[in-house]
């Protein structure tokens, strides 16, 4: 699967997670509805579903992972920034096959596309601090 397919999966997952948080609708129904409107040919659908199901299922744990690296409460974050951080922390915590630098970069790129003017700087700062303090930058992946 091409990396760009996974990037599109993250972008789609972000939009569905945003919608889910605002509407409190069923995440699977939201995903199906969202994908009806998209060209699914260039999206890693399996990864898209992994993200939305994994994040919504383990949302409290992911949020707890984030809290020590935020200088404000989760409730004070914008919905987009919170969703981006959830995707990035999910990848850092659950996907050892994805290099931490990729997770950080993808979070920054999502913030540039969907976030407010300076949200990419905020996302970068939070993720850099988390990677350093949690020791992800020293992680060795054995294949």
Swiss-Prot record:
**Gene Ontology CC terms, in alphabetical order:** cytosol
Instruction: Provide this UniProt record's keywords sorted from A to Z.
Output: RNA-binding, Transcription, Transcription antitermination, Transcription regulation
* GO BP term (any one): transcription antitermination
- Name the domain of life: Bacteria
Question: Recorded GO terms, molecular function?
Answer: RNA binding
Q: What does this protein do?
A: Involved in transcription antitermination. Required for transcription of ribosomal RNA (rRNA) genes. Binds specifically to the boxA antiterminator sequence of the ribosomal RNA (rrn) operons.
Q: Which PANTHER family match?
A: ANTITERMINATION NUSB DOMAIN-CONTAINING PROTEIN, N UTILIZATION SUBSTANCE PROTEIN B-RELATED
Member of which family? Belongs to the NusB family.
The name on file for this protein is Transcription antitermination protein NusB
């Amino acid at each position: 699967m091409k990396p760009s397919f996974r990037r599109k999966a993250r972008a789609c997952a972000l939009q569905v997670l945003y919608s889910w948080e605002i509407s409190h609708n069923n995440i699977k129904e939201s995903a199906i509805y969202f994908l009806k409107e998209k060209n699914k040919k260039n999206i890693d659908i399996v990864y898209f579903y992994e993200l939305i199901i994994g994040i919504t299922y383990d949302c409290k744990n992911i949020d707890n992972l984030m809290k020590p690296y935020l200088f404000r409460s989760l409730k004070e974050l914008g919905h987009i920034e919170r969703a981006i951080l959830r995707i990035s922390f999910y990848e850092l915590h659950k996907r050892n096959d994805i290099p931490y630098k990729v997770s950080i970069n993808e979070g920054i790129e999502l913030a540039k596309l969907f976030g407010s003017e300076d949200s990419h700087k905020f996302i970068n700062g939070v993720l850099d601090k988390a990677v350093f303090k949690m020791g992800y930058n020293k992680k060795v992946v054995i294949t």
